[in-house]
């Protein structure tokens, strides 16, 4: 028997392209177009090159304390991971060990079913409605847990706090995992519900609203008991997942609330103007509460538009996936970048109309 017979087969997650070209408009992986707050002050106070010879803190307690204070929680309710993907992975491995299926929307972050396949977790995709909305009643069935991205990726739609609480009430024997990667761009965080529900785990990230995708910092919040179980699993893999520099930069990003909120508002304003411009061009656009928009044009195939944008050095995201294969996800960049996208789309659509007229 060959060793290949013992391999665990899995279809890996396909990340958005990270091109090395510099003369492009990169709108495919939901990065923040603005730089993070200055870290120079904290580096001068805390960072010493000689400290690189030492292992980092095993639990990033200083950063956890600042996050706990920021959200009015206890430090025992916070765990830091190497990006939210690691925190999600640990959560799947820790909490979803039932024979009943883990429930998730059929249109959502594509890493979820991969975790299930990798960890052999039974799961069930629950169809969203024709407008991509999650139907609360569909999550009131027997399950081994629930995972929902709020706002969702790629649809950018968000549930309100009342809907999430209804799911929590109806599933008090299961962990309900809410992924809030994009919550700062217009959604309503469910962190206040941690005071009432010990079956709630909330995952957030420094990658999007805090402009720190390059250092990989993710966070989970929950009851002290739930977080302690996450630590048990985390420490079974890696005692030192967060390097010292990332911990310092994470703390620095929490120091300037004014700068943080100003950047958020700039992105939201750009998003709303961009949405209006798209609608004027005939696009259908979901009610985005994220730093991206999900769009469809009735007269243009999404795959063809994706390729045309790519040739114009504008990189967006397209999936060959049922129900959304005629939609594109476009990250919100700077005003200048989004204006260039609109100008390209105007020219592309006009050219298409002329071709259609000629064919007639």
From Swiss-Prot:
Q: What is its EC number?
A: 2.6.1.9
* GO molecular function terms attached to this record: histidinol-phosphate transaminase activity; pyridoxal phosphate binding
Know the name of this protein? Answer: Histidinol-phosphate aminotransferase
Q: Which Pfam families match?
A: Aminotran_1_2
Tell me its cofactors: pyridoxal 5'-phosphate
Q: Which residues carry this modification: N6-(pyridoxal phosphate)lysine?
A: 208
List the pathway annotation: Amino-acid biosynthesis; L-histidine biosynthesis; L-histidine from 5-phospho-alpha-D-ribose 1-diphosphate: step 7/9
Enzyme class label: transferase
Q: Which GO terms describe its biological process?
A: L-histidine biosynthetic process
Quaternary organization? Homodimer.
What PANTHER family does the annotation carry? Answer: HISTIDINOL-PHOSPHATE AMINOTRANSFERASE, HISTIDINOL-PHOSPHATE AMINOTRANSFERASE 2
Q: Which family does it belong to?
A: Belongs to the class-II pyridoxal-phosphate-dependent aminotransferase family. Histidinol-phosphate aminotransferase subfamily.
**Does the record bear Amino-acid biosynthesis in its keywords?**
yes
Q: Which reaction does it catalyse?
A: L-histidinol phosphate + 2-oxoglutarate = 3-(imidazol-4-yl)-2-oxopropyl phosphate + L-glutamate
Q: Which UniProt keywords apply?
A: Amino-acid biosynthesis, Aminotransferase, Histidine biosynthesis, Pyridoxal phosphate, Transferase
Q: What InterPro entries does the entry give?
A: Aminotrans_II_pyridoxalP_BS, Aminotransferase_I/II_large, HisP_aminotrans, HistidinolP_aminotransfase, PyrdxlP-dep_Trfase, PyrdxlP-dep_Trfase_major, PyrdxlP-dep_Trfase_small
């Amino acid at each position: 028997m060959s060793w290949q017979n013992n391999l665990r087969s899995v279809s890996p997650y396909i990340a958005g392209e990270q091109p090395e070209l510099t003369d492009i408009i990169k709108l495919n992986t939901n990065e923040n177009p603005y730089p993070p707050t200055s870290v120079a002050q904290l580096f001068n106070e805390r960072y010493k090159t000689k400290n690189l010879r030492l292992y980092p803190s095993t639990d990033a307690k200083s950063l956890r304390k600042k996050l706990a204070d920021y959200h009015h929680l206890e430090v025992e309710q916070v765990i830091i991971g190497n990006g939210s993907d690691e925190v999600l992975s640990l959560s799947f491995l820790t909490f979803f060990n039932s024979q009943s299926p883990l429930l998730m929307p059929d249109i959502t972050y594509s890493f979820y079913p991969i975790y299930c396949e990798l960890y052999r977790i039974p799961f069930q995709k629950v169809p969203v409605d024709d407008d991509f909305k999650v139907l609360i009643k569909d999550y009131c069935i027997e399950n081994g847990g629930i995972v929902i991205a709020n706002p969702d990726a790629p649809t950018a739609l968000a549930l309100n706090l009342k809907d999430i609480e209804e799911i929590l009430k109806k599933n008090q024997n299961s962990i309900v995992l809410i992924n809030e990667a994009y919550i700062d761009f217009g959604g309503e965080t469910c962190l206040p519900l941690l005071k009432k529900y010990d079956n709630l785990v909330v995952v957030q990230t420094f990658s999007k609203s805090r402009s720190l995708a390059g250092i990989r910092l993710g966070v989970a919040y929950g009851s002290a008991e739930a977080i302690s179980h996450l630590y048990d699993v985390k420490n079974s893999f890696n005692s030192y997942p967060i390097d010292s520099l990332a911990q310092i930069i994470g703390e620095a990003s929490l120091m300037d609330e004014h700068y943080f909120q100003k950047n958020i508002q700039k992105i939201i304003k750009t998003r709303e103007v961009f949405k209006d411009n798209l609608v004027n061009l005939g696009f259908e656009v979901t009610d985005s509460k994220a730093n991206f928009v999900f769009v469809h044009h009735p007269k243009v195939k999404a795959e063809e538009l994706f390729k045309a944008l790519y040739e114009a050095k504008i990189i967006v995201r397209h999936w060959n996936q049922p129900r959304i294969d005629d939609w594109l996800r476009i990250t919100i960049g700077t005003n200048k970048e989004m204006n260039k996208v609109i100008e390209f789309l105007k020219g592309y659509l006009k050219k298409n109309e002329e071709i259609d007229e000629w064919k007639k």
